[in-house]
């Protein structure tokens, strides 16, 4: 991935000259490429998911599951070949930067389209979502009915998704909240890739946004509750971009700072109303980031402080205007005890690489976590540790590195605080959920270390390439982009297949049990799902 790839940089940009400013494209010219980029990711994600719904297998039999996984891979490869050919043609005869952006966005959609398509295969023959009417799935279906009939729901649960589900069900699947949740879940899984990719495009060039943003989707996003994890994946880059805007507010007018802050306030409020849990775990880290950032701004003088205060104040005002009522209810209910003990509460709290939740499957009968090679630490975690160190070495001053590092530290502190008091208080307080944030921040820092190293290498090689002809420079860039896209597609195909396989129906207390319950729960009309074992359910 060449550090010179097209896209926004995370380093401070030089202010353009008046001649360059006059030559800027129109507003439509600036927005159109981004719109094409976003649309390509969304269309590929939804289109590939739809194609996968035509895979005809019995997901309750292992041979059917294997055939389904193979059919998914076959479609993925064919779709990627088509996308690669379109990218190559567009790069040769149209705009290479736009072609790269479109290809990266399309691959982000293809990656999570594979995930969503696999879940669709696992749920073939039943109207129920993962976990049927159990747990959170059943609660959301109950709330759907409550909302449509004008009854109140939980005052502390984030309200945006339940209300969206209710409107979605009422519009498309009236009287069938289970089917509505199933279909909306598939759409959300499919759109997770493009959403995360576009969030990281606020900071990074296309290929790096694709790698750092979409790779963590597979180990973090749980198909039974995709609406939860997507907020975490989007929140970190948005917070990093917000921090960057605070630092750059010096060169803006007060009016621009106010409008920018209002936009951030609205975005953060919507994420908060969608799922607030990640704001809680990220709060200590972001408080530290704000202290460091505002200290930098203060050293730039009163003018910088004024504009930063305008941006920060507008952000807070709009956030409170949109989400203030829910925030007040959440704070009022913050003393609600969580006593639910499950598998991960008995695991070494220093381990975060894989979160099993309350569905460990056969792992519950063996040693977990698996013993690592170096002092009990495995190779994967060692790579994350090296990445954290390298990112801090090369980019400690960068907002994205600071946000990821401080949020990781803050999540660790809260995790250890609650775990250390668990015996005394007999409370869990959801601390194992910090595993996802710790893993995500570790992957982000590893990815940023690779990005910064590539930039450092590209800078050293810059003199030689600058003296080369345009054609000599362009050919390796095209080859490099193709190589990276192929490598990432290979990873997405393998990770997607493995993740989907974990959700294939299995009555083993594993993640496969979510689909198993969907196939063994009677349908609303009292009949059994098509592939219920021996036609029996209940």
Language model features: what each stretch is:
Residues 186-295:
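Membrane-embedded helix bundles of polyisoprenyl
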Residues 136, 227, 277-283, 287, ...:
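Transmembrane catalytic cores of multi-pass membrane glycosyltransferases
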Residues 62-73, 127-129, 221-230, 405-445, ...:
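Membrane-helix boundary/interfacial segments in multi-pass membrane proteins
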Residues 1-122:
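Start-transfer (signal-anchor) and selected internal transmembrane alpha helices
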Residues 375-401:
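Hydrophobic, aromatic-rich transmembrane alpha-helices
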Residues 316, 453-498:
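Signature aromatic-anchored transmembrane alpha helix within multi-pass, membrane-resident enzymes
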Residues 118-233:
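Active-site lumenal/periplasmic loops and adjacent helix-entry segments of GT-C-fold
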Residues 101-155, 316-350, 498-514:
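Aromatic-rich transmembrane-lumenal/periplasmic boundary elements in polytopic membrane proteins
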């Amino acid at each position: 991935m060449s550090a010179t790839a097209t896209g926004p940089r995370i380093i401070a940009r030089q202010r353009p000259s008046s001649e360059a400013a006059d030559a800027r494209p129109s507003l439509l010219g600036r927005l159109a490429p981004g719109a094409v980029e976003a649309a390509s990711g969304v269309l590929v994600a939804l289109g590939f998911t739809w194609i996968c719904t035509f895979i005809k297998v019995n997901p309750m039999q292992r041979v059917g599951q294997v055939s389904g996984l193979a059919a998914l891979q076959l479609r993925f490869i064919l779709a990627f070949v088509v996308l690669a050919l379109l990218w190559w043609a567009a790069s040769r005869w149209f705009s290479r930067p736009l072609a790269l952006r479109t290809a990266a966005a399309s691959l982000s959609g293809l990656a999570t389209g594979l995930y969503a398509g696999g879940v669709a295969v696992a749920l073939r023959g039943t109207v129920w979502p993962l976990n049927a009417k159990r747990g959170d799935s059943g609660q959301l279906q109950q709330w759907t009915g409550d909302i449509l009939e004008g009854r109140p729901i939980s005052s502390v649960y984030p309200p945006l998704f339940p209300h969206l589900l209710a409107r979605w069900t009422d519009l498309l699947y009236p009287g069938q909240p289970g089917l509505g949740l199933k279909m909306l879940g598939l759409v959300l899984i499919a759109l997770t890739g493009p959403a995360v990719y576009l969030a990281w495009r606020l900071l990074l060039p296309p290929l790096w946004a694709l790698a750092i943003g979409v790779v963590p989707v597979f180990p973090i996003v749980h198909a039974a509750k995709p609406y939860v994890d997507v907020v975490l994946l989007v929140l970190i880059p948005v917070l990093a971009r917000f921090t960057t805007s605070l630092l750059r507010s010096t060169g803006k007018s007060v009016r621009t700072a106010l409008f920018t802050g209002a936009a951030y306030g609205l975005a953060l409020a919507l994420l908060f109303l969608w799922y607030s849990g990640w704001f809680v775990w990220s709060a200590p880290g972001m408080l530290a980031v704000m202290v460091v950032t505002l200290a930098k701004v203060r050293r730039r003088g009163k003018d910088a402080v004024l504009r930063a205060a305008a941006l920060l104040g507008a952000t807070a005002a709009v956030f409170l205007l949109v989400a203030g009522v829910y925030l007040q209810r959440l704070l009022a209910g913050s003393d609600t005890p969580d006593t639910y003990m499950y598998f991960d509460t008995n695991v070494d709290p220093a381990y975060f690489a894989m979160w099993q939740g309350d569905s460990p499957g056969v792992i519950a009968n063996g040693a977990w976590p698996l013993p690592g090679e170096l002092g009990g630490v495995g190779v994967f975690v060692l790579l994350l540790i090296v990445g954290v160190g390298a990112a801090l070495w090369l980019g400690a001053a960068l907002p994205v590195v600071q946000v990821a590092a401080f949020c990781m530290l803050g999540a660790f502190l809260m995790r250890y605080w609650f775990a250390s008091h668990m015996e005394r208080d007999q409370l869990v307080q959801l601390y194992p959920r910090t595993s996802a944030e710790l893993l995500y921040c570790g992957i982000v820092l590893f990815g940023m270390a690779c990005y910064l190293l590539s930039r450092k290498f590209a800078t050293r090689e810059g003199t030689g390439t600058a003296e080369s002809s345009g054609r000599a420079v362009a050919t390796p860039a095209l080859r490099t982009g193709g190589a990276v896209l192929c490598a990432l597609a290979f990873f997405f195909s393998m990770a997607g297949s493995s993740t989907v396989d974990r959700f294939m129906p299995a009555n083993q207390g594993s993640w496969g049990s979510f689909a198993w319950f969907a196939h063994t729960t009677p349908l609303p009309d009292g009949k059994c799902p098509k592939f219920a074992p021996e036609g029996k359910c209940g």
